[in-house]
Amino acid sequence: FADWLIAEVQGAKREDQVEHYGFFEYGYAIKPWLKNAAVIAVCWLPYEFWLFPGVYWSDTSKQLLIHYGVERFTDHHPFALTYLFGWFADFGQWAFHNSIYGLYLLIVVQLIAAPLLFSWMLLYTRKMGVPQWLCHVELAFLALFPLFPVMFSSLAKDTISVLFFIPFCILFVDGIRTKGSSLSKPGIIITCLLYTSDAADDK
């Protein structure tokens, strides 16, 4: 298996030396990033229409009850996220006379951010040396596996947290692969720490 994996990675590196033309691109650049994110987002659309105006977990309902003073405020749920849900619910009530529509704005943010993050993750695996055919498989899985659109059509601390955890993992892996050189830039270190803090605070 190790020999096969090494051969595949070497083959992928040789592929990088050849210019590829076609709809599916996996180069580490803006255009492939946006294109693959769009593919994922379009494939998720049927689930988004089906699940409108979103799925709200029991934890989210509990946090809203805390925000409105029905339940006692405790540290069982993240403070920042409880306030965030409450503020968007208040905005929905003010702007649309329905708090659910305010909360759905957060789901829309998730449904935009998640395909962009998945596309970044896909392109990074290609950058690591994953062969192009396997990138096709990755893209199909991310776009067609129903768990992902159902998950991000839901609103909960887990769905918010993963939006920070994915980029943290990518930066962390990149730091290991580059033996720390990618973390030498202050901006990257600060970003990584912010992602770590946000992922922890939201979970």
What is the meaning of each model-derived region?
Residues 1-46:
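Start-transfer (signal-anchor) and selected internal transmembrane alpha helices
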Residues 135-146:
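Short helix- or helix-capping micro-motifs
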Residues 68, 120-123, 161-179, 191:
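Specific aromatic-rich, kink-prone transmembrane helix
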Residues 51-64, 72-88, 92, 96-101:
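Extracytoplasmic catalytic/substrate-binding loops of multi-pass membrane glycan-assembly enzymes
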Residues 195-200:
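Conserved small/polar residues in nucleotide/adenosyl-binding loops
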Residues 108-129:
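Transmembrane-helix motifs of polytopic, lipid-linked glycan transferases
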Residues 132-137, 177-194:
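Short hydrophobic alpha-helices at membrane interfaces in multi-pass membrane enzymes
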Residues 150-160:
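Short acidic/glycine- and proline-prone juxtamembrane loop motifs at membrane-interface regions
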